[in-house]
Amino acid sequence: MGLSTATAKNLFVCLSFFLYLIFTIVPWRPVWAQNHKPAVSYEEKKRQANDIAVTVVVSGISCTCARFAEDIRNVVNDLGPDGIRVLPVLGVGGLQNLNDVLFLKNIDMAVVDEDNLRLLKKKDPALYANVEQRVQYITKLYNSEFHVLARNDIKSYDDLKDKKVNFNLKDSQTEVTADTVFDSLKIPVQRSYYDNDEAMKRLLSGDISAMIILTGAPQVTMAKVKKEDGVHFLPLDQDSLPNHDLHGLFANYLPAEITHDLYPNLIAEGTTVPTIANRALLVAYTWPENSQRYNKIAKFIDAFFSKIDQLNSPSRHPKWREVNLSAEMPGWLRFKPAADWLAAHRNQAVSANPDSTPGQSSPELRLAFQKLMQNYASSSGRKTLSTKERELLFARFIKILSESKAEAAAR
């Protein structure tokens, strides 16, 4: 049976439309595809991503160092092809962070503490013989206060004898410093190694008698508790430990204070808790000069140092006010790109706190401080002070001058 005229006409129309598609649209598909090729190839994008990335290993998220790394990332990051990208990495802290910089392939920088070089050399003199040549500091960041939070039945460090005390994670900076402190005091304790959150839970339940954290105050876990929880900070000074010789501790650590402003729920207004502190440093692995990794860290340093003033903001951690990029660290070598930047920017602010730096190294101020030291020596009977003791006195001297200036301006 043959096709009707209408059916044949419909088939002709369909065939014509199909041929139209083939000869008009299909030939243009290669042009369409060509116009939508990616701007860069997969391999090029991969190269760009790696070219701008630098890593910095910190401790846990409750550590002040982690907050600092986040602040640096937020201020410094530039994800353009020629920018710089900071990738914070959560580590353990302390000696482990320094080992991570030394031995892990993809770690460029770390936040460590000042005493780490000395402790590693003491631990294995052969392995770490030239560690100061392989890891060098970029800048000091802040002072890390030694916090010991104890139950109310514990009145002093002596009361912790044979009690359960949490030293934080193994090889963390807290554990390293706590080892030094309790060994120096010759107070034996039952040590545990819980993370901060677990330790706080066990402290409040009475399972342990005290927990220790070494970090820049305020520490977020401790800031959440209050006196009503039955805990308090233990003081660490000669008055609170009259039967102990603390000269060894204060030869290696800074005298410090924990204040009401830092922990208003734990410390009464107008009072302070004496303790010790360590210095937290930003350090880098010393890649060969002008190598790709070396140049990336140098680029990061330029971006970070150039924007240091942007970190003095209420939205940033209050410890940024302690940062002075030009501060020297005895026993450490400065990473060359950092030293070169400071030499080239002598007249530029090198502190996140504009009120903390100007004039502090002026000859007049140094002369006034020398007179203060002379008066101190004659009144106390002590003829010499350690570098750390002089630094603390000078900091207090600056504070007194600032307060006097503010009072005079208010009159």
Model-derived features: positions:
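N-terminal (or domain-start) structured segment
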Residues: H36-V111
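N-terminal secretory signal peptides that target proteins for export/translocation
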Residues: M1-L11
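Pocket-flanking alpha-helical
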Residues: R73-N74, L87-A129, M200-R202, Q219-K226
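Segments of small-molecule ligand-sensing domains
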Residues: P274-A377, K383
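Short Pro/Gly-enriched coil loops immediately N-terminal to beta-strands
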Residues: V131-E145, K226-E228, T275-N278
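Bilobed "Venus flytrap"/periplasmic-binding protein-like clamshell domains
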Residues: D51-L79, I84, N143-S205
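Bacterial N-terminal signal peptides
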Residues: V13-P27
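Pocket-lining segment of extracytoplasmic ligand-binding domains
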Residues: E114, D124-P125, I187-N290
